[in-house]
Amino acid sequence: MDMQQETIERIIRQVLGQVGPAGGSIATLSGDAGVDPFQVAVGVSNRHIHLSRTDMDTLFGPGAELQRKKAMKQPGQFAAEETVTLKGPKGSLSKVRVLGPLRRETQVEVSVADGFALGITPPLRQSGQLDDTPGLTIIGPQGSVTKDHGVIVAQRHIHMHPSTAAKLGLRNGDEVDVEAGGERGGVMHRVLIRVAEASADEMHIDVEEANALCLKNDDVVRICKK
């Protein structure tokens, strides 16, 4: 097979959504990431922050509103134009993206390596589980705020629509294994299933996990039920 023909066939497979794990580029609201119903597209999360209304006012000025930069696959969620600096006991991280919409409580999501750089040890947690977590100082253009908790390393998880969960025999809170193909492929254990009506089927991992398996946004992995 010559190079041109091979390229054409690869493009056709991608368009049809039939590329194997870690080889596709598929985004869907229905969960059909290909012929195999257990396939799901990957979203890679870099460090970011979710802000409360009170902290938004302190950092960006009273009544400030987030400016949309880019829509995310989860309905209603977006990356904002606004960024902040995170300052810990040891160091700081600049240009940390704010994600919208605003939340009830401020939550910072970083990698393990980010924790080393900041001088804190954030635990591996589900989103929203902020008890007994470290804090830091958040610096914005109009002010700063020091939090006594709220920093986590996010547990890898799969957002899933109820119709997909029913089809796969999964429930909210289940944990599954997920297989990634490719030269640096492997199996990720204890991947949390998060089922909600306002969800698009997508697996969320952080940059460290993505780098370890050579995964990027929209690559396709496969759910392996325990």
UniProtKB/Swiss-Prot annotation:
<feature type="binding site">
    <location>
        <begin position="44"/>
        <end position="46"/>
    </location>
    <ligand>
        <name>CoA</name>
    </ligand>
</feature>
<feature type="binding site">
    <location>
        <position position="157"/>
    </location>
    <ligand>
        <name>Zn(2+) 2</name>
    </ligand>
</feature>
<dbReference type="InterPro" id="IPR009010">
    <property type="entry name" value="Asp_de-COase-like_dom_sf"/>
</dbReference>
<protein>
    <recommendedName>
        <fullName>Phosphate propanoyltransferase</fullName>
        <ecNumber>2.3.1.222</ecNumber>
    </recommendedName>
</protein>
<feature type="binding site">
    <location>
        <position position="211"/>
    </location>
    <ligand>
        <name>CoA</name>
    </ligand>
</feature>
<dbReference type="GO" id="GO:0051144">
    <property type="term" value="P:propanediol catabolic process"/>
</dbReference>
<feature type="binding site">
    <location>
        <position position="90"/>
    </location>
    <ligand>
        <name>CoA</name>
    </ligand>
</feature>
<keyword id="KW-0479">Metal-binding</keyword>
<comment type="similarity">
    <text>Belongs to the PduL family.</text>
</comment>
<feature type="binding site">
    <location>
        <position position="204"/>
    </location>
    <ligand>
        <name>Zn(2+) 2</name>
    </ligand>
</feature>
<dbReference type="GO" id="GO:0046872">
    <property type="term" value="F:metal ion binding"/>
</dbReference>
<feature type="binding site">
    <location>
        <position position="72"/>
    </location>
    <ligand>
        <name>CoA</name>
    </ligand>
</feature>
<feature type="binding site">
    <location>
        <position position="103"/>
    </location>
    <ligand>
        <name>phosphate</name>
    </ligand>
</feature>
<dbReference type="GO" id="GO:0016747">
    <property type="term" value="F:acyltransferase activity, transferring groups other than amino-acyl groups"/>
</dbReference>
<comment type="function">
    <text>Involved in 1,2-propanediol (1,2-PD) utilization within the bacterial microcompartment (BMC) dedicated to 1,2-PD degradation by catalyzing the conversion of propanoyl-CoA to propanoyl-phosphate. CoA is regenerated within the pdu BMC (for use by PduP) via this enzyme, although there must also be cofactor transport across the BMC. Directly targeted to the BMC. Phosphate is probably the first substrate to bind in the forward direction. CoA is probably the first substrate to bind in the reverse direction, and might bind to the enzyme as the BMC assembles, ensuring cofactor encapsulation.</text>
</comment>
<keyword id="KW-0862">Zinc</keyword>
<feature type="binding site">
    <location>
        <position position="116"/>
    </location>
    <ligand>
        <name>CoA</name>
    </ligand>
</feature>
<feature type="binding site">
    <location>
        <position position="50"/>
    </location>
    <ligand>
        <name>Zn(2+) 1</name>
    </ligand>
</feature>
<keyword id="KW-0012">Acyltransferase</keyword>
<comment type="subunit">
    <text>Full-length protein forms large oligomers. Homodimer, when purified in the absence of the encapsulation peptide (EP, residues 1-47). The EP may influence oligomerization.</text>
</comment>
<feature type="binding site">
    <location>
        <position position="48"/>
    </location>
    <ligand>
        <name>Zn(2+) 1</name>
    </ligand>
</feature>
<dbReference type="GO" id="GO:0042802">
    <property type="term" value="F:identical protein binding"/>
</dbReference>
<feature type="binding site">
    <location>
        <position position="159"/>
    </location>
    <ligand>
        <name>Zn(2+) 2</name>
    </ligand>
</feature>
<keyword id="KW-0808">Transferase</keyword>
<feature type="binding site">
    <location>
        <position position="97"/>
    </location>
    <ligand>
        <name>CoA</name>
    </ligand>
</feature>
<feature type="binding site">
    <location>
        <position position="109"/>
    </location>
    <ligand>
        <name>Zn(2+) 1</name>
    </ligand>
</feature>
<dbReference type="GO" id="GO:0031469">
    <property type="term" value="C:bacterial microcompartment"/>
</dbReference>
<dbReference type="InterPro" id="IPR008300">
    <property type="entry name" value="PTAC"/>
</dbReference>
<keyword id="KW-1283">Bacterial microcompartment</keyword>
<dbReference type="Pfam" id="PF06130">
    <property type="entry name" value="PTAC"/>
</dbReference>
<comment type="pathway">
    <text>Polyol metabolism; 1,2-propanediol degradation.</text>
</comment>
